[in-house]
């Protein structure tokens, strides 16, 4: 699966929330179907995301690139340390959670 293609498709046809604060909030409330975290995200943020995602039974995928690369992949002119997939739309992005 082409992660870049599926992420962009999810952004166009579904609902994707960017940012660590919003991702942690959605992990706490169980409002996400998948969370993606950049490999170089700050440890405190990663720890919070993994902790709350586990409590809410939300899969977390660690993106192999940096937050700069994740932001670029999404077509954003800023870094993205984490994001939450609320609605995948027409994408098959949730398949990466099964790996």
Curated annotation (Swiss-Prot):
Recorded hits in Gene3D superfamilies, A to Z, give: 3.30.1330.30
Cited InterPro entries: Ribosomal_eL30, Ribosomal_eL30-like, Ribosomal_eL30-like_sf, Ribosomal_eL30_CS, Ribosomal_eL8/eL30/eS12/Gad45
GO CC terms on record? Answer: cytosolic large ribosomal subunit
Listed SUPFAM superfamilies = L30e-like
Single annotated GO MF: structural constituent of ribosome
- Transmembrane parts of this sequence: none
Entry keyword Ribonucleoprotein: yes
User: PROSITE patterns, alphabetically?
Assistant: RIBOSOMAL_L30E_1 (PS00709), RIBOSOMAL_L30E_2 (PS00993)
GO terms, biological process: translation
Keyword Ribonucleoprotein attributed = yes
Pfam families registered for this protein in UniProt: Ribosomal_L7Ae (PF01248)
Q: What does the UniProt keyword field contain? A: Ribonucleoprotein, Ribosomal protein
Q: Sorted alphabetically, which NCBIfam families does this protein's record hold?
A: PRK01018.1 (NF002172)
HAMAP family recorded: Ribosomal_eL30
Oligomeric state and interaction partners are given as: Part of the 50S ribosomal subunit.
Q: Write out the similarity annotation.
A: Belongs to the eukaryotic ribosomal protein eL30 family.
Please identify the protein, giving its name as recorded. Answer: Large ribosomal subunit protein eL30
């Amino acid at each position: 699966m082409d992660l870049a293609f599926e992420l962009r498709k999810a952004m166009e046809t579904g609902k994707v929330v960017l940012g660590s604060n919003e991702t942690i909030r959605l992990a706490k409330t169980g409002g996400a179907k998948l969370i993606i975290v950049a490999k170089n995200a700050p440890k405190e943020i990663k720890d919070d995301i993994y902790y709350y995602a586990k409590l809410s039974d939300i899969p977390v995928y660690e993106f192999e690139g940096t937050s700069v690369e994740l932001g670029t992949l999404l077509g954003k002119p800023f870094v993205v340390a984490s994001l939450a997939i609320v609605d995948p739309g027409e994408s098959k992005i949730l398949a990466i959670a099964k790996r």
